[in-house]
């Protein structure tokens, strides 16, 4: 798509309930961490969908690569997903620290993933909150938990969405709750639409990213 060899609609996979998925660039070197010079092509590609999407959800990799940072600082909402592992907590803190100190992002939502009990998710959030309160000037909001659930693994094996394969599973219930939360999050203002807001922020990120590498 970025090379102009096909249109975005040629690679989109249609999912249930109007969900559209743009598959990740598995095994393609350089696609997971696009340089700022490629943002224009990305924006043009997604511009084809500007009249069709209610929500644009970007699932980035873990860590603080330039690609991750570019998408995160352009997003209206940053949802940090953490699990109870030292590497996950370190990645989450590093992302929050860089976005807050270098790009002025001051509010983050935190989702605890693969926890055994809701209380464990709250405790995980409290640990991250304590560190951020001590060293950073940011606001963290608890977005909930997604429990460890064997049904999720089974859904992956079946190559089916969890909410279709096992709609009554604990993880499916948690994801439904999260989706209902997202619907209540405030909408972007100052742009003619949700995608336009995101694209404006992406364009603003180009000189910032270029300046950081000079």
Describe the role of every protein-language-model region:
Residues 55-154:
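Conserved catalytic-core segment of NTP-binding enzymes
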Residues 191-214:
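A short, charged, Gly/Pro-tolerant segment at domain boundaries
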Residues 156-175:
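C-terminal boundary of histidine-terminating zinc-finger modules
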Residues 170-188:
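Extended, charge-rich low-complexity interaction segments
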Residues 1-51, 151-161:
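P-loop/Walker-type NTP enzyme "switch/lid" segment
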Residues 164, 187-194:
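C-terminal helical "lid" subdomain and adjoining coupling/linker elements of P-loop NTPases
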């Amino acid at each position: 798509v970025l090379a102009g060899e096909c249109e975005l609609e040629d690679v989109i996979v249609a999912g249930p309930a109007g969900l559209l998925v743009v598959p990740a660039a598995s095994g393609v070197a350089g696609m997971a961490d696009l340089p700022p010079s490629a943002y224009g092509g990305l924006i043009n590609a997604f511009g084809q969908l500007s009249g069709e999407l209610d929500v644009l959800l970007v699932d980035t990799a873990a860590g603080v690569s330039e690609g991750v940072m570019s998408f995160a600082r352009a997003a209206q909402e940053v949802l940090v997903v953490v699990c109870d592992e030292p590497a996950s907590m370190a990645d989450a803190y590093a992302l929050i620290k860089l976005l807050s100190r270098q790009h002025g992002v001051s509010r983050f939502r935190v989702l605890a993933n693969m926890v055994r009990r809701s209380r464990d998710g709250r405790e995980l959030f409290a640990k991250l909150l304590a560190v951020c309160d001590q060293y950073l000037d940011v606001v963290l909001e608890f977005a909930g938990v997604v429990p460890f659930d064997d049904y999720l693994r089974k859904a992956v094996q079946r190559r089916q969405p969890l909410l279709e394969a096992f709609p009554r599973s604990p993880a499916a219930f948690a994801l439904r709750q999260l989706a209902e939360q997202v619907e209540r999050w405030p909408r972007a203002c100052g742009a003619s639409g949700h995608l336009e807001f995101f694209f404006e922020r992406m364009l603003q990120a180009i000189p910032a990213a270029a300046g950081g590498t000079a």
